């Protein structure tokens, strides 16, 4: 719903300004908190999980029940803590990383070979391309992007 979209926008702003934001403690809809801390392979793992986990260590602190609010909302809340990790450089162009992750998850039922076809250079191959986006961890996405970038650069010099 609207709450999910609003909190997503806030988190994207935090990522953009991560050099200024060392730590965040916030209360959000439980569903969003679960999405943020999700691991590869889970149904809730997605764009927000990958982007935030690339730069922040996520801790799910506790659940807040509906009854503590007046009037009570229809959803549970959760308090989470984001602490910026030591990853300063992605090892690849940030724009490429965001593009690969977004494009991949926008067609999450397809393998990356099919979903990111427009991003990968001609003739490029990688074992990651045979997987669906939810099967890749943060380091896998970074490695894929570094490989794409290296391959693009080889093509540029020809």
Where are these regions (language model features)?
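Class I S-adenosyl-L-methionine
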Residues: 6-135, 143, 153-158
């Amino acid at each position: 719903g609207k709450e999910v979209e609003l909190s997503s926008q806030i988190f994207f702003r935090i990522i953009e300004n991560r050099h200024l934001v060392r730590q965040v403690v916030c209360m959000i809809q439980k569903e969003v908190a679960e999405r943020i801390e999700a691991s590869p392979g889970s149904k809730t793992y997605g764009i927000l999980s990958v982007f935030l986990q690339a730069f922040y260590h996520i801790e799910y602190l506790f659940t807040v029940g509906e009854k503590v609010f007046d009037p009570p909302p229809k959803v549970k809340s959760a308090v989470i803590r984001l602490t910026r990790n030591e990853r300063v450089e992605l090892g690849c162009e940030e724009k490429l990383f965001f593009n690969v992750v977004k494009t991949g998850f926008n067609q999450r039922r397809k393998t990356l070979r099919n979903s990111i076809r427009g991003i990968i250079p001609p003739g490029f191959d990688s074992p990651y391309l045979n997987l669906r986006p939810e099967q890749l961890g943060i380091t896998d996405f970074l490695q894929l992007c570094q490989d794409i970038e290296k391959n693009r650069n080889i093509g540029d010099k020809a």
